[in-house]
UniProtKB/Swiss-Prot annotation:
It holds the Pfam family IF2_N. One of its GO terms (molecular function) is GTPase activity. Residues 187-196 have a biased composition (Basic residues). The keyword Nucleotide-binding applies. Residues 409-412 are annotated as: G4. It is found in: Cytoplasm. One of the essential components for the initiation of protein synthesis. Protects formylmethionyl-tRNA from spontaneous hydrolysis and promotes its binding to the 30S ribosomal subunits. Also involved in the hydrolysis of GTP during the formation of the 70S ribosomal complex. This is Translation initiation factor IF-2. Belongs to the TRAFAC class translation factor GTPase superfamily. Classic translation factor GTPase family. IF-2 subfamily. Keywords: Cytoplasm, GTP-binding, Initiation factor, Nucleotide-binding, Protein biosynthesis. It comes from Enterococcus faecalis (strain ATCC 700802 / V583). Residues 40-207 are annotated as: Disordered. Residues 309-316 are annotated as: G1. Residues 334-338 are annotated as: G2.
Length: 798
């Protein structure tokens, strides 16, 4: 027999489903609710618990007989329905060979249609009496099946008008209702023609949602909504909304909650509220803090050495000698155009070298090289001595607090004087060790490989003293040495790893760009899969070209790296837009004040050299007190992108004489907000500049009387002051104008109006012939017939 549900058993025993469920729990049965299914043994226990055990035995017996008859007589289910009426009457005296299921269906049809059949009333009476005695779940027993043969026959004979069992008790037989429910439950086993129209079996009950315990701590961020909190504490949003409603807070599941509400809700649930600190993923500088390094994982790393000095003093030649390669031959004109990063192995000890340009235009690149280095080699030519870029390199190294090794180069040349170099450098606090100082001096010849080993020994000695260490196990961080856009590879960046190990495939944020390391190439042009601390590598895979000097950080996943890179690019764009606007002839007065000294930066471009010189000389002759003209650049030719870049960097105005800007320069000028003025006549250009420069002078003001009014009445109001009822006798009085109180021709007070009203309404201006009420700031000693004079200060144009 199939399992029975709790609500069916409760209906049979005239008990509430809840009582049966509770009794089942007491007996240790795993029942969730009234839809739970129980076995026949569990049903027996429940009936015995409610005092009805004998009925269960009869039911079980009937159930067994029913199963046997169903198995033996399955083909007989269809045969009686096809018999002729005469055969059906003969079948009434035949022993009952029909299955219980077939009889149940026929009896069900009789009960459902409710038509009378007087031929079988006596048999129905016997059946009903027997049903009341047995009251089993199927509504019939084996004896009942024997005595109800005539019912079957009568039913088959009268299929057009089916008969109804009469219940002498005054209502429909309860057993027949149970029989109807049981038939519906077992009909899915029925095969044959009528099985198509039978009802589907009841689906199993959906298991109840598993109860999950509340967490001990609610980690929240301010602004979380109800739906987010519901997921964290494993509760329905409706439950949280109801609880908040009981606390007096009306919200929906998508409404953001403040910090206090979230904490009160957590306390009400018995959890400890803990605010989660929001981490700014776009802030990559925090990865470079010393606290982020784990001391236990530190290992010795190679030193980073920067070669600095004046142009053409032999820096690249020295590195060329160290690398045994011809780096100089590949440079334009033999002058280093960008920072080169190389790693050399000296007796099993690697050293990373950075070669910086010595030209005057590369100041920022030298400063960047000094900021990421451990040791600075200052190359000075013995025949040339200390030069401007030499002094600049010294200042960069001192600012970065980096030890300096002085390499006196070109000692092989005639006229070389290393002692003179030492004398000059001692004036800049670089005193040789033999003179009692702490600076190492090495006399070398990079061209002929003289004393190079001594220089390398001193580098390794200082590196050992400095005890340089790094953590190779963490995510890689470092600095961009240089970057470019390659036609075949796309954005290419040369990186110097400072901490951690960089791998191929790592998600990376470089400055305001992001991407994944696709190809990693070392300084020898070979592909590597990883790069440790103090190792320079060239990578591809970025979405844009970063700026030299930008920092890079490796992230856990590409999604986070993309978010950080996009956020950094967005912030950089907003910062650029919010920066102060460029100088134009229209805003010179507001934007070019430098204390007492003011100057206008101008770039002059002309069609011929003579015109450029003439315009420059004429502009410099403009004599306006306190303002001077500075010619940043003067040249011949069209206004190009370089001119716009220079103007943006120097905050200058471009004057074009008989020339036009190129389309690229015009577009860049719009982006950089650089002011370009084009002229064909010299004196008009001079006049325009002179007019703008006059606007830079401190303005002079003169007083202008706007009107006068007479005091006719006084109203003294406590805690407010004296209100004067006035009549305008001349001109007009403005709310923002200055006023003088004149009594008997003598000015007794000068100040500003506190309020000006007409008919209790604040007004900006009262004209001639109108009355008004006025109050003067910090002055209440007004009298009737006092004159109040209004005035404003106007700027005098120069």
């Amino acid at each position: 027999m199939g399992k029975k549900r709790i609500y069916e058993l409760a209906k049979e025993m005239n008990k509430a489903s809840k009582d049966v469920v509770d009794k089942a729990h007491q007996l240790g049965m795993d029942v969730k609710n009234h839809m739970g299914a129980i076995s026949s043994e569990q049903e027996t226990k429940l009936r015995q618990a409610f005092g009805g055990g004998s009925t269960v035995n009869t039911q079980s017996k009937a159930t067994n007989n029913q199963k046997q008859q169903t198995t033996q007589n399955k083909p007989a289910n269809k045969k009686p329905m096809n018999n002729k009426p005469g055969e059906q009457r003969n079948n009434q005296n035949r022993p009952n060979n029909q299955s219980t299921n077939g009889q149940q269906r026929n009896n069900n049809n009789q009960n459902r249609h409710g038509q009378s059949n007087t031929q079988n009333r006596s048999n129905q009476t016997n059946t009903n009496n027997q049903n009341r005695n047995t009251q089993n779940n199927n509504g019939s027993t084996t004896n009942q099946n024997r005595t109800s043969q005539n019912n079957n026959g009568g039913n088959n004979q009268n299929r057009g008008g089916q008969n109804r069992n009469n219940n002498f008790g005054g209502g429909q037989n309860r057993n027949n209702r149970n029989n109807f429910n049981n038939q519906n439950r077992n009909r899915f086993n029925k095969k044959g023609k009528k099985g198509k129209h039978q009802q589907e079996s009841a689906k199993p009950a959906v298991p109840a949602r598993k109860f999950r315990e509340l967490p001990d701590v609610l980690e929240y961020t301010e602004g979380m909504n109800v739906a987010d909190i519901a997921k964290k504490i494993h509760r329905e949003p409706a439950e949280i909304i109801k609880k908040l409603f009981m606390m007096g807070v009306m919200v929906n599941q998508n409404q953001a909650l403040d910090k206090d509400t979230i904490e009160l809700l957590a306390v009400d649930y018995g959890m400890e509220p803990q605010e989660k600190v929001q981490v700014d993923i776009a802030d990559i500088d925090k990865f470079f803090e010393p606290e982020a390094v784990v001391e236990e994982n530190l290992t010795t790393r190679p030193p980073v050495v920067t070669i600095m000095g004046h142009v053409d003093h032999g820096k690249t030649t020295l590195l060329d000698t160290l690398r045994h390669s011809r780096v100089t031959s590949g440079e334009a004109g033999g002058i280093t155009q960008h920072i080169g990063a190389y790693q050399l192995d000296i007796d099993g000890k690697p050293i990373t070298f950075l070669d910086t340009p010595g030209h005057a235009a590369f100041t920022s690149m030298r400063a960047r090289g000094a900021s990421i280095t451990d040791i600075t080699i200052l190359v000075v030519a013995a025949d040339d001595g200390v030069m401007p870029q030499t002094i600049e390199a010294i200042n960069h190294a001192k600012a970065a607090k980096v030890p300096i090794i002085v390499a006196v180069n070109k000692i092989d040349k005639p006229g070389a004087n290393p002692d003179h170099v030492k004398q000059e450098l001692s004036e800049h606090e670089l005193i040789p060790e033999e003179w009692g100082g702490d600076t190492i001096f090495v006399n070398i010849s990079a061209k002929f490989n003289q004393n190079i080993d001594e220089l390398l020994e001193n580098i390794l000695l200082i590196a050992e003293v400095e005890d340089l260490k790094a953590d190779p196990t963490q995510k890689a961080i470092g600095t961009v040495i240089e970057a470019r856009l390659d036609k075949g590879k796309g954005p290419v960046a040369t990186l110097l790893v400072q901490q951690g190990t960089l791998h191929v495939g790592d998600p990376i944020v470089v400055g305001n760009t992001y991407g994944r390391v696709r190809v990693m190439t070392n300084d020898m042009g070979r592909r590597d899969k990883e790069a440790g601390p103090a190792t320079p590598v060239e990578i591809t895979g970025l979405n844009d070209v970063p700026q030299a000097g930008d920092r890079f950080v490796v992230f856990e996943d590409e999604k986070t790296a993309r978010q950080a890179g996009e956020e950094r690019a967005k912030r950089a764009l907003l910062e650029q837009r919010s920066a102060s606007s460029r100088v134009t002839l229209d805003n010179l007065f507001e934007s070019l004040k430098e204390g007492e000294l003011k100057e206008v930066n101008i770039i002059v471009k002309a069609d011929v050299q003579g015109s450029a010189e003439a315009v420059s000389a004429s502009l410099q002759k403009i004599d306006v007190e306190g303002v001077r003209v500075k010619i940043v650049h003067a040249a011949v030719g069209a206004i190009n992108e370089s001119d716009v870049t220079l103007a943006a960097a120097s905050n200058a105005i471009i004057i074009g004489f008989n020339v036009r800007p190129t389309p690229q320069a015009k577009q860049q000028a719009e982006q950089e907000e650089v002011d370009i003025r084009l002229h064909r006549i010299i004196y008009k250009a001079l006049e325009e500049i002179e007019t703008a420069m006059k606007g830079l002078l401190d303005p002079e003001f003169e007083e202008k009387i706007t009107g006068q009014m007479t005091v006719r009445e006084l109203y003294k109001v406590s805690k407010v002051g004296t209100i004067a009822g006035c009549y305008v006798t001349e001109g007009f009085i403005r709310r923002d104008s200055g006023v003088r109180v004149i009594r008997d021709g003598i000015v007794i007070y000068e100040g500003k109006l506190a309020s000006l009203k007409r008919f209790k309404d604040d007004v900006k201006e009262v004209k001639l012939g109108f009355e008004c009420g006025a109050m003067i700031e910090n002055f209440n000693d007004l009298r009737v017939d006092d004159a109040i004079e209004g005035f404003i200060m106007e700027e005098i144009k120069q």
